[in-house]
Amino acid sequence: MTKSIRFTKMHGAGNDYIYVNTMAYPIDNPEELSIAWSKPHTGIGSDGLVLIGSSDIADFSMHIYNADGSEAMMCGNASRCIGKYVYEAGLTQKNKVTLETLSGIKELQLKIEREEVTEVTVDMGMPAVGEMALEVEAGGEIYTGTVISMGNPHLVIFVDEMDQVGLASVGPLLECLPLFPDRTNVEFVQVLKPDEVRMRVWERGSGITQACGTGACATAVAGVVRGKTKRKTKVIMDGGPLTIEWDERSGKVFMTGGAVNVFEGFIKV
């Protein structure tokens, strides 16, 4: 027996996911659906599937499934999109929303103009800084990376010229290094100015994506601990910029950016 599920495709800085309100449309096989729906030619096309649900400890819950069906701990871009979704769908009237994720509760501050959410700031919590100058080998090259956790793992590598990075070939090798038994996200970063960097990302479970919110946060933290950037930095990704601030007093990382509704519809399962 088939049923129709309503979905909304949204993106944050080009990082696009399929969003489903599971309070209205329950889903019991998200891994399979994420794989099928993420395919651009035979599905909807996305970086994965995000389920919005109820929560006993926050306003809403978020579960993220990558394009390969694996479940992600956290996604900053998806968090911003959920902030826009729940407000504009009438699920909340608050401009400050709490979101339960696998990496803890996140607070979203919504900027609202004419009943539309134009910008969302996410309290991403405190980062965990691992090895600051880890040498790794991939594809016959030696890279020096900084290990950062934003609730999910990141390897941040600073380079002089972004255009010389073969992300499609080296990304999957670095993702699956034995040093990272659960695999890792990989960011290559070129410093443009003390408060501006360019970043490209290979996401664990999804490959090359237009943007990664937690990756932008990890990039900003790595820039500070490596003495390369200021605490407030614009991170420019293929899908657009995010403003990241690592607050010195609280130790928390704050991410600010937009969220966009692309289209919505029904799909049969």
From Swiss-Prot:
Coarse class of the protein's main subcellular location: cytoplasm
Pathway stated in the Swiss-Prot or TrEMBL entry: Amino-acid biosynthesis; L-lysine biosynthesis via DAP pathway; DL-2,6-diaminopimelate from LL-2,6-diaminopimelate: step 1/1
GO molecular function annotations of the record: diaminopimelate epimerase activity
Reactions mediated catalytically: (2S,6S)-2,6-diaminopimelate = meso-2,6-diaminopimelate
EC class of the enzyme, as a word: isomerase
GO BP, one annotated term: lysine biosynthetic process via diaminopimelate
Active-site positions on this chain: C75 (proton donor), C212 (proton acceptor)
Cellular component terms per the entry's GO annotation: cytosol
One Pfam family matching this protein: DAP_epimerase
InterPro entries: DAP_epimerase_AS (IPR018510), DAP_epimerase_DapF (IPR001653)
Matches recorded under SUPFAM superfamilies: Diaminopimelate epimerase-like
Amino acids binding substrate: N15, N66, G76, N77, N152, N185, E203, R204, G213, T214
Stored PROSITE patterns: DAP_EPIMERASE (PS01326)
Subcellular location per the Swiss-Prot or TrEMBL entry: Cytoplasm
Summary of the function given for this chain in its UniProt record: Catalyzes the stereoinversion of LL-2,6-diaminopimelate (L,L-DAP) to meso-diaminopimelate (meso-DAP), a precursor of L-lysine and an essential component of the bacterial peptidoglycan.
Subunit structure: Homodimer.
HAMAP family the record matches: DAP_epimerase
Protein name, as recorded: Diaminopimelate epimerase
Gene that encodes the chain: dapF
